[in-house]
Structures are given as C-alpha cells and as structure tokens.
Amino acid sequence: MTVAVGDEIPVFTRTTGFANWNRYAAVNDEFVPIHMDDDAGRAAGMAGAFGMGNLQWAYLHNVVRDWLGDRGRIVRMECQFRAVNTKGQIVSAHGRVESVRERADDLLVELRVWTEDQDGNQLAPGTCTAVVNR
C-alpha cells in the first residue's frame, strides 16, 4: 500500500435517521430519549431527535478501516462533537493523510478525519493514527 501526504481516503456516507440510530442504540444499549423521540429532542432545545455523537465517531472508524482493509490498524482516534446530525441528513466521513513516518516494518500514518453534512458543514473533526503494514 502506497501512502503519501495529502492522500484523500475514500468517503464513507450514510443517511441518518431512526433506523441507523436504533441499530446503534441496540448494540450499545444507548436508548436515550433525545435520540429516539422528536418530542424529547425538542424538549432538549433541538428541532427534534438527533443522532448520537459516538455514532459519528464510529463513522470515522469505518472510513479509516475501509481504507486500511487488512493492510493495517487504527491505533488512536480522537474527535470533537461540534454539531449534531439530524434525521434525513447525509453524513459523510472523510480523511486526509497529514504525515507518514517510515519505520522498520511499517508506516505510522497521521490522518485528519472529520464528518460533515450534505452542505459541507463539519460535524465532528478529529485526528487518527494508523499503522500501515509494508
């Protein structure tokens, strides 16, 4: 696998809503009313129910894992939840290689990662460190 600074990794995209949120909640036992009920979301000051922040973090993991395949592994992932995702939004996860350090048996790759909505507004910017096998 060839990796260079500036490489953009293939985008991971999902349309958000109750179906995705319910599956995520079932796996993580996260049935929080603000994520499942529009009235609860409105009571919290939002337009309605909204997606879990950790689901966006999972989308970031997906985009990097899809890019790495069996050629490497994620060793660190961090992000900040700056905006919510709402029902019907198209959320895409992106990544760009920021640095590559050659080591004896592998490459240590630093990526800038982020989720954004269909209008290009960043929802969860972050960073990721991955090891890429030679």
Report each predicted region and the residues it spans.
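Charge-rich, low-complexity amphipathic helices
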Residues: M46, F50, R82-I90
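Short structured motifs
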Residues: R76-R82
